[in-house]
Every structure is written in structure tokens, then in C-alpha cells.
């Protein structure tokens, strides 16, 4: 059972491992969007948007509904936003760490000398 869960997690995170897919999920926070709306929002071809959405759909992350000629996509489980929010928090924490490190390096530089001048 533990191996199955680890495999599920690996496949799940693999489905999320594309910047466009992450952006699409964030765009779906406010509700469903058509493929055309998504492709226009991110300035990508509809075929590319459809391909990326298919990856998310195949993993059950988004669901699709057809209405005439349009296919609407929505989030299947809104818990995904907690995960995206945690990822954003980790990103912010890393930026804070880098900023702190750069400030410390800057304080160590002799007056009138920048870090770049020492390299």
C-alpha cells in the first residue's frame, strides 16, 4: 500500500510539473473556463492548451464538460489550491532566505566595494 501511495504521489506531482499547467490551475480558482479562454489568457495555441489540460484531466485534477462546440474545464478537487498555496509559501520563504543571504554578503563587503567587484 505504501508503494502504491508513493507511486500515486509521484505521478500526481509529475502532472503538476509544468509552469503552464500550474498557471492554468490558478486561473481555474474562480471557476470553469473554456479551452479558448485559457489559450487566449496564456497566449498559447488551443492545441497546446488542450494537451496540457489533458494531462491534468487524465490525473483527475481537472474535469471537462462539453457544451456545444465548447469544452469547459474546472477543478475536480479544490484541495489542490492548498497545495498550490503551500508551494507559493515555500517559494516566498526561499526568496526571503536568498534576500537575507544577499544582505549579509553586502554587509561583509568593504565600503565602496560591491560583491560583483570582488568576484
Where are the predicted features?
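N-terminal positioning helix adjacent to the helix-turn-helix/winged-helix DNA-binding module
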Residues: 5-8, 20, 67
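Short amphipathic alpha-helical boundary/capping segments
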Residues: 8-16
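Short, cationic-aromatic polyanion-contact patches
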Residues: 17, 68-86
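Pre-recognition alpha-helix immediately N-terminal to the DNA-recognition helix
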Residues: 22-24
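Base-recognition residues in the alpha-helical recognition helix of bacterial helix-turn-helix
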Residues: 26, 51, 69
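Residues within helix-turn-helix
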Residues: 34-36, 47, 54
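Beta-hairpin "wing" of winged helix-turn-helix
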Residues: 57-67, 74
